[in-house]
Amino acid sequence: LKDWRVDEEYAEQCRTAAAAWNDSVEAAYALDHHPLPAQSAIIGAVEAATNDRDVIVGAAGSLPGDLHKLWRTRDPKGYHVEYAFSCMGYEIAAGLGVKMADPSREVFVFVGDGSYLMMNSEIITSIQEDIKIIVILVVNHGFQSIGALSESVGVERFGTTYRYRDQAGQLAGDKLPLDLAANAASLGAQVIRANNLEEFRAALVQARANTITTVVHIEDDPTIAAPDSGSWWDVPVAEVSTRTSTREALVRYEEARTAQRHFLRPTNWGDPDSPS
């Protein structure tokens, strides 16, 4: 395959598509949303603050998908993101491991508040062992990725936000008094609270200059989505429901399935008498 190349027409299509997507990325990075920034703008600020040898780490929630779509990797070892099992809690521990593997690189860990709550204990390990990492703690007061997924199949975001129960017994009361910045400080990390993108950019500069693990805490608006990839995730929808939203989601799901192409099929595919 050494000398094999696609034809020029197809290569030009690829270049055009790549340029168009790059324009979408730039627009997502430039979003100036208030009062809370979009997650894509936070990612863009980190990309602008990193150099070619820095490493980013991520794992669960909406961050891996957004990083996969938006982040422009500049080094083969500069991008360490776990996708397959969406392992909540992997991020900080993985960042510690990456830094141990190559102490010469600055490591930026992207983690949402849901994953942070699952496992943050390696912060104290990083302090104990004098292994500095930078943790970008993106707070949206809940499990927003799975919340959005549940909405996409026609059901509400049940139990996916950090709320008190209301008088009706539902998890729709006031926000819980969660202060993950204080928690990170209690584990020995330097903590910088950023209230907007300008403060966030300054915090990234300070975090790089610090000599111990630093957590940069910023809230974002979970309703501002990154550009759509155009791909489709086969997540089945309940076939029987009293909810209008679920029935409508089922129609969309069944329509989307018609576009599936099966490249690998058993030899008895479509045989009604087959036991499989």
PLM feature segments, named:
Residues D7, A38, T242-T244:
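Helix N-terminus capping/helix-initiation residues
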Residues L1, G65-D66, L70-S276:
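Thiamine diphosphate
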Residues E8, C14-A17, V25, D75, ...:
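Short, isolated positions within intrinsically disordered regulatory regions of eukaryotic proteins
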Residues E12-Q13, A59-A60, I218-E219:
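Short coil/turn segments at secondary-structure boundaries
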Residues L1-T16, R208:
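Glycine-rich, acidic loop regions that bind phosphate or pyrophosphate groups
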Residues W4, E8, W21-L36, R53, ...:
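Short secondary-structure junctions and interdomain/linker hinges
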Residues T16-A94, V98:
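Active-site diphosphate/adenylate-binding microenvironment
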